[in-house]
Amino acid sequence: MEKYGKDFKYEDFIPMWKAENWDPKQWAEIFKEAGAEYVVLTTKHHDGFCLFPSKYTHFNSVEMGPKRNITGELTEAVRDAGIRMGLYYSGLIDWQYANDPIFEDDDLFGTASPTFAYADYSYNQMKELVDDYAPSVFWNDIGWPTQSEEMMPYFLAHYYNKVPEGVVNDRFNDRYHDFLTKEYKSGSVNRKEKWEMCRGMGLSFGYNANEGDDKLISVPDLISLLVGTVANNGNLLLNIGPKQTEQFRKTGKEAEDSWRMAES
């Protein structure tokens, strides 16, 4: 309110985003140096803004904001670096289709898949991502719209036909998965099944300018988390949300350097 005023809308941020400093090749080099086996990009989160061109919405980074296909550019750079590319998609929640305000955590799920129109939209966009980018990992979030539950097998069949070696996570309404996910959680795991630990560098997945370095996971704790995860047949998916300058926090680079030294 103090900085932008009461009439400023979420969508008003989009023209301010130019992505002038974004270099997908540099990102891919950092991922490769860190020893990443795969990368997962958030193509659309709960706000509904897409980082790829879509036949189903103008609310995307090619027609608005930076006027760039973030998904396509990073996919090409990551694959050129010899790393598998995965895509995240918020399948059940899209606030462009919801009108109810969110005051607490429970309200978040009250906005999930509010209409049949959104269920169709979500299905079509998921297929669009598979057709255009053939991701090695399809990371669906929250769940699958119940209004189009019968379309889930068709989507999964389409994905595996397009990407025979591809894998999907466990957020397809518990009906099918190639690996389980744990998000900011610890505790016992089933070592007989493949799983993935997912968390951010700090307390949030996106970059938070008000989140100080004291809130970030320390280098020793990060290495301990990685070793413990891999030793229990899991993978670590570490979210490293960039700053508004498209650059990573210094701490993220320090963790990468420390891990390389620990390997040598």
Question: Can you say where each PLM-predicted feature lies in the sequence?
Answer:
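Mature catalytic domains of secreted/periplasmic carbohydrate-active enzymes
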Residues: 1-264
